[in-house]
UniProtKB/Swiss-Prot annotation:
<keyword id="KW-0133">Cell shape</keyword>
<dbReference type="InterPro" id="IPR000291">
    <property type="entry name" value="D-Ala_lig_Van_CS"/>
</dbReference>
<keyword id="KW-0547">Nucleotide-binding</keyword>
<dbReference type="GO" id="GO:0046872">
    <property type="term" value="F:metal ion binding"/>
</dbReference>
<dbReference type="GO" id="GO:0008716">
    <property type="term" value="F:D-alanine-D-alanine ligase activity"/>
</dbReference>
<dbReference type="InterPro" id="IPR013815">
    <property type="entry name" value="ATP_grasp_subdomain_1"/>
</dbReference>
<keyword id="KW-0464">Manganese</keyword>
<dbReference type="InterPro" id="IPR011127">
    <property type="entry name" value="Dala_Dala_lig_N"/>
</dbReference>
<feature type="binding site">
    <location>
        <position position="316"/>
    </location>
    <ligand>
        <name>Mg(2+) 1</name>
    </ligand>
</feature>
<keyword id="KW-0436">Ligase</keyword>
<comment type="pathway">
    <text>Cell wall biogenesis; peptidoglycan biosynthesis.</text>
</comment>
<feature type="binding site">
    <location>
        <position position="328"/>
    </location>
    <ligand>
        <name>Mg(2+) 2</name>
    </ligand>
</feature>
<keyword id="KW-0963">Cytoplasm</keyword>
<dbReference type="GO" id="GO:0009252">
    <property type="term" value="P:peptidoglycan biosynthetic process"/>
</dbReference>
<dbReference type="GO" id="GO:0005524">
    <property type="term" value="F:ATP binding"/>
</dbReference>
<keyword id="KW-0479">Metal-binding</keyword>
<dbReference type="GO" id="GO:0005829">
    <property type="term" value="C:cytosol"/>
</dbReference>
Length: 371
């Protein structure tokens, strides 16, 4: 067993079963590199694409995109383990290795679930950690589930009086958009898995003849699909951070500018543009008027509270001629070296190690259970 010391022991959990597995690994590598070793004793736990948990060495260099190759957790990455859903075990990570089955490999104080997408960012691991009685960074079960599902995010935002874009939800068994809906949405539309991120499975449709293929592509990742009206406007983002005393703050605003990439002219911020090439320009701070920035920060905090979020979130907006429109809420935003969330906080005067420490401290202060 890894011996205890006076530092807070943090289990950074990454990988997972979703199609965002690789991005989770890259985010974890960045976090492992920036957690303050004087304050935190870090344990790295990878989850394979089929859901097995392994204790890894946590070397950040193994969790990077190298020459276009995406990182992945495998059974060979470390020792198989489990986290018992028993609060009496006090965060024990138990070996599943035949040679040492049941041995306690480590006992952790808090979990940092750097998981993107289903089976991680959607309330599932948060539920496990609640059962296990282990504090964790980020949103609770309800907010994680609501933030992951674009349909229910929009429902909660609308109920709070926040502006959202027009959309149609296609549940399993429905494979088209009616003529009335097409007239209402207009073109282009964006077809997305309802519970996904990193633009995986997302298509831009500029002709209704392209819709069936776009729905099929989205359904490779989620049986529920959302068709969103294209919104003409600037893409802005704002980070939200909760502190241990319950105070909630919003970051400097960032902007994503995408021209035609790889010979395309659609300016679509897709997976490759985000992570594999230089097709996007990220402006932090965004070049917007002070009153616009202030309004977006206020809306970001309102959106954070509308889904009962905790810990942190990144709120994405379109800035249109009629004002800001809330696009999405990410309850566990990316933490790669190019991710907007840490960059926006750095521009706000909060460096990366301080940002991560605030998240861990907030998780410990919050604890588990009803709150």
């Amino acid at each position: 067993m890894i011996a205890r010391n006076q530092r807070t022991r943090v289990a950074v959990v990454y990988g997972g079963r979703s199609s965002e597995h690789a991005i989770s690994c890259v985010s974890a590598g960045s976090i492992l590199r920036n957690l303050d070793p004087e304050r935190f004793d870090v344990v790295a736990v990878g989850i394979t694409p089929d859901g097995s948990w392994v204790l890894t060495d946590g070397r950040p260099e193994t969790l990077a995109i190298t020459d276009g190759r995406l990182p992945e957790v495998s059974a060979e990455s470390g020792t198989a383990l489990a986290l018992p859903a028993d609060p009496g075990r006090r965060g024990e990570l138990v070996s599943l290795s035949p040679a040492a089955a049941g041995e306690v490999l480590a006992a952790v104080d808090v979990v940092f679930p750097v998981l993107h997408g289903p089976y991680g960012e959607d309330g599932t691991i948060q539920g496990l950690l609640e059962l296990a009685g282990v504090p964790y960074v980020g949103a609770g079960v309800l907010a994680s589930a609501a933030g992951m599902d674009k349909e229910f995010t929009k429902k909660l935002l609308v109920a709070e009086g926040l502006p959202v874009g027009d959309h149609v939800v296609l549940r399993p068994g429905r494979a088209n958009v009616t003529l009335d809906e097409r007239e209402r949405l207009g073109l282009p539309v964006f077809v997305k898995p309802a519970r996904g991120g990193s633009s995986i499975g997302v298509s831009r449709v500029s002709d209704w003849a392209e819709l069936p293929a776009a729905i099929e592509a989205a359904r490779r990742h989620d049986p529920k699909v959302i068709v969103e009206a294209g919104i003409a406007g600037r893409e802005l983002e704002c980070g939200v951070l909760e502190y241990p005393d319950g105070r909630v703050d919003a970051s400097t605003i960032g902007e994503i500018r995408v021209a035609g990439v790889r010979g395309r002219e659609d300016g679509f911020y897709d997976f490759a543009t985000k992570y594999l090439d230089d097709g996007a320009e990220l402006d932090v701070p965004a070049k917007v008027e002070d009153d616009v920035a202030d309004e977006i920060r206020r809306l970001a905090i309102r959106a954070f509270r509308a889904i009962d979020c905790q810990g942190l979130a990144r709120v994405d907006f379109f800035l249109t001629d009629d004002g800001p429109v809330v696009n999405e809420i990410n309850t566990m935003p990316g933490f790669t070296t190019i991710s907007m969330y840490p960059r926006m906080w750095a521009a706000s005067g909060v460096d990366y190690p301080t940002l991560l420490a605030a998240m861990v401290d907030t998780a410990v202060a919050r604890g588990t259970g009803l709150r």
